């Protein structure tokens, strides 16, 4: 991470272009100041919270320091075990070894503590990612539910309109049937009158005097 470069100039040899996240967390937005940075990143930078990048860098530095201490310790052992080494050199090496041994216990505690901090931050980031994905899925389901309700309402409206039209047609058909029934009733009455006239003529032999049928 320390090899990342956030400047606007040419990237130095042995370094690489820093990511937006790294540059924002490091308060170095010289390069990304030329471009539009995601607003959420800037909001995150404003919040005072422990940065995983910084804590990981601290852990890496401690591990590197431990490697150097181990290397120095092994070199001091070589000096002490070498028969050609002078007495003063051996005494000096032993004194330095004692200092390293004393520092070792504290150093191991520091590394352990820093590793726990980094692991906690990693777990926290994973939980935040899961929560964000869960929120996205919930939002998608909410949108789908709204669309489904809207379509269902539209279909119901069309069905109601169709039912109304069908009812109107049924009403017209009923009126037509009523008209036909009335016409049939009139025809029946006329037929009865005609039958009476015919019977009267048959019984009295023609038209009665003074009446026109």
UniProtKB/Swiss-Prot annotation:
It comes from the Viruses. Residues 122-142 have a biased composition (Basic and acidic residues). Residues 54-78, 108-151 form a coiled coil. Residues 189-199 have a biased composition (Basic residues). Residues 122-213 are annotated as: Disordered. Keywords: Coiled coil. Disulfide bonds: none annotated. Residues 146-188 have a biased composition (Low complexity). Belongs to the mimivirus R546 family. This is Uncharacterized protein R546. It comes from Acanthamoeba polyphaga mimivirus. The lineage of its organism: Viruses, Varidnaviria, Bamfordvirae, Nucleocytoviricota, Megaviricetes.
């Amino acid at each position: 991470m320390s090899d990342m470069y956030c400047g606007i100039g040419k990237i130095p040899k042995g370094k690489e272009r820093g990511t937006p996240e790294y540059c924002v967390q490091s308060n170095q937005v010289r390069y990304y100041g030329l471009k539009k940075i995601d607003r959420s990143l800037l909001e995150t930078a404003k919040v005072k919270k422990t940065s995983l990048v910084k804590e990981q860098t601290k852990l890496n530095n401690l591990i590197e320091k431990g490697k150097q201490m181990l290397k120095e310790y092994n070199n001091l052992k070589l000096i002490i075990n070498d028969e050609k080494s002078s007495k003063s050199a051996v005494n000096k090496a032993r004194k330095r070894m004692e200092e390293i041994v004393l520092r070792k216990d504290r150093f191991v505690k520091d590394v352990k503590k820093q590793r726990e901090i980094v692991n906690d931050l990693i777990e926290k980031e994973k939980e935040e990612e899961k929560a964000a994905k869960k929120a996205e899925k919930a939002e998608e389901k909410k949108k789908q539910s709204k669309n489904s309700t809207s379509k269902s309402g539209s279909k119901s409206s069309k069905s109601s309109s169709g039912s109304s039209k069908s009812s109107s047609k049924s009403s017209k058909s009923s009126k037509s049937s009523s008209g036909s029934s009335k016409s049939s009733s009139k025809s029946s009455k006329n037929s009865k009158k005609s039958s009476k006239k015919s019977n009267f003529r048959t019984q009295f032999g023609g038209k009665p005097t003074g009446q026109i049928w």
